[in-house]
């Protein structure tokens, strides 16, 4: 009998123990990360050939205490290595663990290598060579506090390497973890399996191998025991022959059907190649498809299992498509897969909650460094309508708004407009359309609102929005709105660089829905920009706090003699330049200046016929004791702007301060008169939110119109 150790991913030890016992192992004992067991030569070779869950099978050679590097050296050298492998074989050492004396695994591996080489040299006057890549023999040393364990790795390469994936790392799941997921899913051999997000097909291939009784080690071409001097080739040949016979028979007899789909054609090509190499291609149908539009590919016959490892994001707020996908997927399961089982393996329990399904079983496991969960669901035998009334009041309001506004927007010649703006207090979001894409802005809920309820309402809003507007998952973007401080409004939220052009009257603008808090176009200023265009012919135009220069574009298209665009952000100025180029507004008459607008304003001595300024409500600045407050400081601002405004010129001043009050008495002292035009600048899509901005036209005193 051999004493052996099978390692596995944490969380899979009990499954592995059961598997080894089925293979004939005795005296199985679970420890963290594996199972100790006893077995004769046949059991040992069968565990190597047939274990779907083990990472490695190790043959312990010695165990001893280590209080110094000399103890490590002597303990390893005490093994008669000439009885383990030939001096003509290559070897490598894998060392893990440290203690007070051996603090570096590389140092530990070096001491072990020296001990093995010296052992051969003293006995045979020859030394074996070390090979880092595919050595004939792999020695495993594990140091835990003062105890060292030395073992021969009978596996060679990890047992998760079955030989059917030709590129390492082409899939996020190791094969032995995938096998565990299949076993935990509740799937029964003989019933169908569907993976609607199959990637390179690992889950389906592992399940098909089980259905066809195909040993996971059958097609491996390298083992760690072939150079072991006690290797019994005859028993190994018997194990191989038995596995070959069982596979041929199993492949002929199985009636299981497997269907995999994925939106990415390239990974499907990988999946087909992997299935061919595994010998189970005839059992699996791979087809391109979007999981958010999944139909049951096997509606007739026995109910089966939908099993998948869906995508997940590091930040939920940056992955609205995943929220939408999971939410839709839950409805699809209930409506199109009655009596089926559903099992999903994910690193995001929060995303799984979007399914709105109650799990009957739950398992935890590690996928590399990630803490993951597998949840199993038993779907009702009564199909639900796919038109589930999620957030019904919100959906009805959105449907009504879309019907009214879509026709209006087409008449106006605009691609971007607001569809919904917290019309219903319990659904505190804004929904904006940008051509065929939609942005949902979640206003950060107050602390008094239960976070879980707020999150679930957001999920409902996403689901209802996609359902009402007929969106696919890649047409939706989610943003969270909260007060911006300092430079946070300029900071990147993503790096997708997905710009596209939209139309606003006769202007074109580049928008980016993902990378920044804002999209590049303030929709509520649409009419103000149009008015500036109508006022600009033959004028010298100044745009302060210009953002991406949308007002400058309208002024340029309106025939402005010159435009000057000032903003502190290089990113937004480059964006403004792209907007000008998209509208064929190029030349030296269109200046772009990167500067702190307040500092630039204080030193500027040019004059302009038409000025547009839309300052922040509050910001930090090097001037005015480091802050700017539009209510407190607007008269100071007007005083500076008056110097730059030509006689007969017009200043348009807008801000987003709720309850803003113009100081008319101080304004009169400055020598300016103001006319509020807020109602004239508010368009139909912002009719419900009269306080989204306030807007004023100012002129020199005595020039009132």
Curated annotation (Swiss-Prot):
Q: List the CDD domains hit by this protein, alphabetically.
A: AdoMet_MTases, THUMP_AdoMetMT
InterPro entries named among the record's database cross-references: 23SrRNA_methyltr_KL (IPR017244), DNA_methylase_N6_adenine_CS (IPR002052), RlmKL-like_Mtase (IPR000241), RlmKL-like_Mtase_CS (IPR053943), RlmL_1st (IPR054170), SAM-dep_methyl-trfase (IPR019614), SAM-dependent_MTases_sf (IPR029063), THUMP_dom (IPR004114)
All copies of domain THUMP, residue ranges = 43-154
Q: Which EC number(s) are documented for this chain?
A: 2.1.1.173, 2.1.1.264
Q: Keywords, A to Z?
A: Cytoplasm, Methyltransferase, RNA-binding, rRNA processing, S-adenosyl-L-methionine, Transferase
Q: Which Gene3D superfamilies match?
A: 3.30.2130.30, RNA methyltransferase domain (HRMD) like (3.30.750.80), Vaccinia Virus protein VP39 (3.40.50.150)
Pull one GO CC term from this UniProt entry. Answer: cytoplasm
Q: Which GO terms describe its molecular function?
A: 23S rRNA (guanine(2445)-N(2))-methyltransferase activity; RNA binding; rRNA (guanine-N7-)-methyltransferase activity
Catalytic reactions of this protein: guanosine(2445) in 23S rRNA + S-adenosyl-L-methionine = N(2)-methylguanosine(2445) in 23S rRNA + S-adenosyl-L-homocysteine + H(+); guanosine(2069) in 23S rRNA + S-adenosyl-L-methionine = N(2)-methylguanosine(2069) in 23S rRNA + S-adenosyl-L-homocysteine + H(+)
What's the chief localization of this chain? cytoplasm
Question: Which Pfam families does the annotation name?
Answer: Methyltrans_SAM, RlmL_1st, THUMP, UPF0020
Main EC class of this protein?
Answer: transferase
Q: Where in the cell is it found?
A: Cytoplasm
What's this protein's family per the entry? Belongs to the methyltransferase superfamily. RlmKL family.
**PANTHER family, A to Z:** RIBOSOMAL RNA LARGE SUBUNIT METHYLTRANSFERASE K/L, RIBOSOMAL RNA LARGE SUBUNIT METHYLTRANSFERASE K_L
Tell me the function of this protein.
Specifically methylates the guanine in position 2445 (m2G2445) and the guanine in position 2069 (m7G2069) of 23S rRNA.
Protein name per its UniProtKB record: Ribosomal RNA large subunit methyltransferase K/L
From what organism does this protein derive? Photorhabdus laumondii subsp. laumondii (strain DSM 15139 / CIP 105565 / TT01) (Photorhabdus luminescens subsp. laumondii)
In the UniProt record, the gene name given for this protein reads: rlmL
